[in-house]
Amino acid sequence: MAKNMAQIFPFIAVFLSCSFIFVLSSSQNSQSLYHNPQSTSSSSSKPSLLVLPIQQDASTGLHWANIHKRTPLMQVPVLLDLNGKHLWVTCSYHYSSSTYQAPFCHSTQCSRANSHHCFTCTDSATSRPGCHNNTCALMSSNPVTQEAGFGELAQDVLAIHSTHGSKLGPMVRVLQYLFSCAPSFLAQKGLPNNVQGPLGLGHAPISLQNQLFSHFGLKRQFAMCLSRYPTSNGAILFGDIYDLDNNYIHNSIDVLIDMVYTPLRISQQGEYFMQVNAIRVNKHMVVPTKNPSMLSSYHGDSRIGGAMITTTNPYTILHHSIFEVFTQVFANNMPKEAQVESVGPFGLCYDSRKLSGGIPSVEFVMDSHDDVWRISDENLMVQAQNGVSCLGFVDGGMHTRTEIVLGTHQLEENMVVFDLERSRVEFNSNSLKSHGKTCANIFDLNNA
């Protein structure tokens, strides 16, 4: 017996050593969901707030971000699309990643992405990212040109910054982030230079925030602060921004105490709307002549009333009936001698040198007359040409889908919070400038 034990003891020792190595390896792998590409963080400390820096594109007025994807991680520039259903990028050229996967048709991932069709690739004789057979087909669209096409549902690593007190924390990873490899023609028009596709934040199963909420167990809330200046960053925060223990928003009491809120309505397509019952210019009500109740009525899902919040229109678009009266009331409160020929796409422009008397106040009145969003001078006017300032609102014609489509110029330098748990949208009643702040200086975005 002793002899037999002596013979098998080396095998037991080897087995125990291998088991220890396997347990250690498994422990390390379990931590990889919250792994910083530069340094290791513990899996026991799940992030409560995530940060994505955002920049303005000077040529289009739209906003974009660098997301970190693939293995090894690399920066991928994408357009911010508040109402988009998912992230899509073009994978036809230069997509290199050791962790790319294309889920099989009718798989769990397909169901999660609401993909009910199979994808067959005809572009290439060999398989590559974005080109496999018997995978999931997902419809993607360019939010600027409205072109659309089927692509391949894919999954790969995505990394995003966490926070550590008032500073940026380590990057954390989602190992199987779902997105679409879309046809390359979708990215050829309308998008800022070098952008590879849009990053969707709409109310949809595989939009960015919903995958982050699910993966990290975050509070279902995200905040957006878009910078007016191409040389400085704004940011989107995912998670509980009101948790003062996070302390990430500098002087958060000053920034957040000024917030007012109104119900958040979501269309069947997952787009974000808020009710605007009235527009006031220097306290004068803007009342459409042909339909006085246009702003205060709600039309349901067939034609959503109110204001759609977007990040893919640089300027706010108004239904013609509203635009006509709004510009007339605004012009009545401006010096007539300052008005000049309009510069497209705007309908009302002025000689900047003759505007020393100030700009009329414009307020959007929400469900309650106490809930008012005051649009600052900088958010109202656009420097269309040298020496020419225009009212930054565009005539949308008679057949708009909704009365108001809020554009990025009016949203810049405001904190806008989408509280999906309480179905409400919150915003500063006055721009951050009234507090002496900007989107760039209320966040620490160093080394982002």
Curated annotation (Swiss-Prot):
Gene3D superfamilies: Acid Proteases
Swiss-Prot/TrEMBL site (Cleavage) positions: S296, S297
Entry keywords, A to Z: Allergen, Disulfide bond, Glycoprotein, Secreted, Signal
Signal peptide annotation: 1-33
Paired cysteines (S-S): C91-C181, C105-C118, C110-C136, C121-C131, C349-C390
Localisation: Secreted, Extracellular space
InterPro entries xrefs: Aspartic_peptidase_A1, PEPTIDASE_A1, Peptidase_aspartic_dom_sf, TAXi_C, TAXi_N, Xylanase_inhibitor_I-like
Pfam families: TAXi_C, TAXi_N
GO MF term set: aspartic-type endopeptidase activity
Domain Peptidase A1: from-to ranges: 63-428
Residues bearing carbohydrate: N133
Induction text: Secreted in high amounts upon heat treatment of mature seeds.
General function of this protein: Sulfur-rich seed storage protein that remains undegraded at germination.
Miscellaneous comment in the UniProt entry for this protein: Capable of reducing glycaemia in mammals. Resistant to pancreatin-mediated digestion.
UniProt similarity note: Belongs to the peptidase A1 family.
UniProt-recorded name of the protein: Gamma conglutin 2
Organism lineage: Eukaryota, Viridiplantae, Streptophyta, Embryophyta, Tracheophyta
